[in-house]
Amino acid sequence: MHCSSPKMVCETKIVADEHEAIAGTKKDSIIVSSSQMWTSSSASPSALESKIEKRNQVFIREFERSDHEEVRRIFNEGIMERIPNSAFRGLKQQTTTQFMYAFLTVMCYVMTKSFTLTFCAPFILMGARYYYSRKVILSYLDCALHTDMADIEAYYMKPTGSCFWVAVLQGQVVGIVAAQSREDDNTVELRRMSVDSHFRGKGIAKALGRRVIEFAMLNNYSAVVLGTTAVKMAAHKLYESLGFRRVGETEDYTLPGMTRSPLERLFFQIRYSHYRLQLHEE
């Protein structure tokens, strides 16, 4: 059971529901009269369409050593997006924290009697949230870049039951995803999924997710599992569209690299959602 098993498809062309969203792949009707003829030097409409379609096809293939820099770039950019999302967007989901910040603002007025300072209090609190979100997420990124993302071949390509894929468009790596075996419960974990921000909305993430599911099915795993701290609902809808079911949540989750200091706990909170796609019963 290995990602380079001969029976497995190592390079897969995307066939996704969002196929029309990939620029240049939607074919327009062309009506040609019987009097129109193409010379040997002219390109027929079908040939032109075929050339455009081929240029815009996205392929999922196994990671190669030459992909390393692009993979790290995509992963790094995806993680950095979580800083403002966690600091500001995430607050909408944290009712208790909202009340706490409101209480601190009121106490600021009670203790100082200063309207100016009270007016500034919410901005100070948001600034502190951004600072600690950046601090925690940069620590998490550093941990990842010095563990599995430092040596993808050793962590994902060599071990039995694990693999790492990249999505390639026009010769450029535009997306990544990994699968890691969990032999204790015969499941595989979907990890490190990220798509270049310039190529989102084209069905690439869904195709990467399907590749992991296909890998799990071919290797007779009972389920695919994943965990996400994503704040944006689009990420959760993606997993649900692939058939995953949310099976639990961990409030106030501790990311690798966190110190759990009082100020860090006050200004950084994140929810960890657990998803599972059951493939077959044990």
From Swiss-Prot:
Residues 110-269 form the N-acetyltransferase domain. The chain crosses the membrane at residues 103-125. InterPro entries: Acyl_CoA_acyltransferase, GNAT_dom, NAT_camello-type. It is an enzyme of class 2 (transferase). Keywords: Acyltransferase, Cytoplasm, Endoplasmic reticulum, Membrane, Microsome, Mitochondrion, Transferase, Transmembrane, Transmembrane helix. It is found in: Cytoplasm; Microsome membrane; Mitochondrion membrane; Endoplasmic reticulum membrane. Its EC number is 2.3.1.17. GO terms for cellular component: endoplasmic reticulum membrane; intracellular membrane-bounded organelle; mitochondrial membrane; mitochondrion. Its main location: cytoplasm. It is a single-pass membrane protein. Catalyzes the synthesis of N-acetylaspartate acid (NAA) from L-aspartate and acetyl-CoA. This is N-acetylaspartate synthetase. It comes from Danio rerio.
